[in-house]
Design a protein with these regions (language model features):
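Positively charged n-region of N-terminal signal peptides that target proteins for export
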Residues: 1-4
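Short helix-onset patch at the extreme N-terminus, typifying the N->h transition
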Residues: 6-8, 22-23
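C-terminal motif of bacterial Sec signal peptides marking the signal peptidase cleavage site
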Residues: 12-15
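N-terminal pre-ligand scaffold of iron-sulfur
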Residues: 19-103, 120, 137-152
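Short cysteine/histidine-rich metal-coordination sites, predominantly Zn2+-binding motifs
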Residues: 103-115, 126-139
């Protein structure tokens, strides 16, 4: 009987698919200024995206700041928590800054325009809503008063 239990346990362990590590791995260090540059994040709920620059269109990082592989999405959830995610879709064959998720109109989800994967962001989880391998890559965020830091 013990052997049968051991065989079943071994089979279960071998048959489970290993997800491996999230393929999105960008370097992140971003200072938040909730009084000026990032004041739109003070509202609940709210979000802001930080994209690699196209002159006059997107965010231009300050000296020493890094915004991940595809850019950053910072969310202020209804529970007054801040969360940060990489915008690169982790379920693309080769995640990069050319295929980034976009926040939908009601701010519930972020959606990849290429593969169609939806990620839950309003609750701060970043999980994939369909049966995809990976959720959005999350980063540490620390907010104190009117400033904060996003890092990995």
């Amino acid at each position: 009987m013990k052997r049968l239990g051991l065989v079943i346990l071994l089979f279960a362990v071998i048959s489970c698919e290993r997800l491996g590590e999230n393929p999105v791995n960008g370097s992140v260090y971003l200072r938040l200024d909730l009084l000026n540059r990032d004041k739109e994040l003070r509202g609940i709920p709210s979000y802001k995206t930080y994209l690699y620059s196209r002159p006059g269109v997107d965010y231009n990082p300050q000296q020493g700041e890094r915004i991940g592989l595809g850019g950053l999405l910072v969310v202020h959830t209804p529970l007054a928590e801040y969360r940060a995610f990489d915008l690169a879709c982790p379920n693309e064959q080769i995640p990069n800054r050319n295929t980034i998720v976009e926040v939908d109109a009601n701010m519930l989800n972020a959606v990849c325009p290429r593969c169609g994967t939806k990620y839950q962001i309003l609750d701060g989880s970043g999980i994939a809503l369909e049966s995809k391998k990976y959720g959005l890559r999350s980063y540490r965020i620390s907010v104190s008063g009117n400033s904060g830091i996003v890092s990995n």
